[in-house]
Design a protein with these regions (language model features):
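Formylglycine-dependent sulfatase
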Residues: 8, 15-467, 477-498, 525-554
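Residues forming the ATP-binding cleft of Hanks-type serine/threonine protein kinase domains
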Residues: 474
């Protein structure tokens, strides 16, 4: 072959290699993962029933209308740090080691951004991080810990070691500052020759809810609809674990909106946290319990929804920019909250419980190139599945250490594979911390939920009464009728218990992490008559301890 021919052939081959590489890059979509803190499905128009007419989320609703909306997406532990750890590792908390708010994920174990970078993506993390260790992204600008709503401060890259490089924005609101930072990254940092993987994480609407003053008038003259269970729950609801023997623990299990819980309630928090706004004394005997609960509920919902409105308005800014830059339709956009949240149902606040209001995550995925608009799916998705989905869209192999599984085919067809999971696993470890929630675990299928309140801390101590609850989600989607002891559900109960025990092993929760806690779990698993009598005794003992603690506090 002549030299000129060899040169020409080499140029052609090089051009083909280069062209094929560019094609592969162009075929890979950008990925934008948006997560708000405590944004529950009940407060999104695409999901909401009670609050739908308030229309707090037109931008998110439009995203849902253009993609797929999942009705059965769940976190495996309804608390901020563990949920985020599941998403960045694809592992359950008992595997990645983040059981509670004190957990952290080492840089070398931050699997999702590491693999995205290896796949040729430019990676960025902006907003709430809450995993303590330095983020392993090409770019990061993250809140310290939980962060503040105003005078936003970020930890950034710089000459000093993590976490000493800090930038502050006096007078800013976090939702605005986080969005400003994301838009600045797109305008100043994005490499147009690479696909991007951006995690944009709002602090809002985490409590205590503080919105920008421009939202003060939003809903000011509106009476927010109240869930019926805010006021009363049937006698069939709950168990000795959540009510106590003869209802003796109703004041002490789960923090409240109204005065029910004397240790912590939103009614008591309002004048303490917002003294200029709420000058009334909730202990005033001239204010009835009904009046106080109604005042507290209206404040709780309005403050929360104003934060949600700030999130939605800022998302419009981001989506408008992506459209202007012709990036919107070439980007897989995922919207979620890190867990659900109580909006007054059952007179509970915060999250943490295995009940759907706090365990369910909103989950919306839009990518018009392969996902049709207006799809809804009842497939069971867990937050450990999120990173596998994103890696799948990026063309990466899913590593064996990830316990989650990609649900891309469900996004693109609306159909579950024959071998798709039929149950979600849940475990909350922070027994009686912050919001008075007992240690619990559950299995949830599409039709039933079985919850085991084992009721102890990591050392098997500070016990609350153990009990089981079973809910028929088809007949009782609000989980108000515990059918665990009803004869007609005995077969369902026994079958679910066997499935539950197997699921624990399948996900790696074998109890070896905290053996003393596991001894309690096993001790009351069968829940025979002797166990029930011991649970009554534990209920009495806990009530006495709690009443003594409250007396000492006074």
């Amino acid at each position: 072959m002549k030299r000129s021919a060899r040169i020409f052939l080499g140029l052609v081959c090089g051009w083909l290699v280069t062209f094929s590489g560019v094609a592969r890059s162009e075929d890979r979509p950008n990925i934008l993962f948006i997560m708000s803190d405590d944004h529950t499905a009940q407060a999104i128009g695409a999901y909401a029933t009670l609050l739908k007419e308030l229309d707090p989320t037109p931008t998110i609703d439009a995203l849902a209308a253009d993609g797929i909306c999942f009705d059965n997406a769940f976190c495996t532990n309804s608390i901020c740090t563990p949920s985020r750890a599941c998403i960045i590792t694809g592992q359950y908390d008992h595997v990645n080691g983040v059981f509670d708010l004190g957990g952290r994920i080492a840089r070398e174990k931050q699997t999702l951004p590491i693999l995205m970078r290896a796949q040729g993506y430019q990676t960025a993390m902006i907003g709430k991080w809450h995993l303590k260790v330095e983020p392993n992204y090409d770019f990061y600008k993250v809140l310290p810990g939980q962060g503040k709503y105003f005078d936003t401060e970020f930890r950034i890259q710089g000459v000093k070691p993590w976490p000493k490089n800090v930038v502050k924005y006096p007078g800013s609101h976090s939702s605005d500052a986080i969005m400003d930072s994301t838009l600045a990254w797109f305008k100043e940092q994005r490499n147009p020759d690479k696909p991007f993987f951006v995690c944009h994480h709002f602090k809002a609407p985490h409590d205590y809810f503080e919105s920008h003053p421009r939202y003060d008038s939003y809903l000011a003259d509106v009476d927010i609809p109240e869930p019926a269970s805010l006021w009363e729950k049937p006698d069939t609801w709950g168990s000795v674990a959540t009510r106590g023997y003869q209802d003796e623990l109703i004041p002490h299990i789960g923090t409240s909106i109204g005065r029910r819980n004397p240790r912590r309630s939103y009614a008591a928090d309002l004048p303490r946290v917002f003294p200029d706004e709420f000058k009334w004394d909730y202990r005033n005997p001239n204010l009835t319990d009904v009046v106080v609960k109604r005042l507290a509920y209206q404040a709780y919902l309005k403050k929360y929804l104003r934060c949600v409105k700030g999130v939605d308005d800022n998302l419009k800014r981001l989506f408008d920019y992506l459209k202007e830059e012709n990036l919107f339709d070439n980007t897989v956009i995922i919207y979620t909250g890190d867990q659900g949240f109580w909006l007054g149902e059952k007179d509970y606040q915060d999250k943490r419980w295995a009940y759907d209001e706090s365990a369910r995550m909103p989950l919306i995925v839009r990518y018009p190139k392969t996902i049709s608009s207006g799809i809804r799916s009842d497939a069971i998705i867990e937050n450990v599945d999120f990173p596998a989905l994103m890696l799948d869209f990026a063309g990466a192999e899913i590593p064996s250490q990830m316990q989650g599984r990609s649900f891309r085919s469900i996004c693109e067809t609306g159909i579950e594979p024959d071998d798709w999971k039929q149950a979600a696993y849940y475990r909350y470890w922070m027994h009686m911390a912050h919001h008075d929630n007992p240690g619990e675990m559950s299995i949830r299928t599409k039709n039933h939920k079985l919850i085991y309140f084992y009721g102890c801390d990591y050392q098997g101590e500070k016990q609350t009464p153990p009990a089981w609850e079973l809910y028929d989600l088809v007949k009782d989607p609000r989980e108000l009728n515990n059918v665990y002891d009803q004869p007609e559900y005995r077969e369902v109960r026994d079958r679910l218990k066997v499935q539950f025990a197997k699921l624990r092993l399948d996900v790696g929760d074998d109890g070896s992490h905290y053996p003393a806690c596991e001894r309690i779990v096993q001790e009351f698993w069968d829940y025979d008559e002797a166990d029930r009598q011991r649970a009554i005794k534990i209920s009495n003992q806990f009530r006495q301890r709690r009443e003594a603690e409250l007396a000492d506090r006074k």
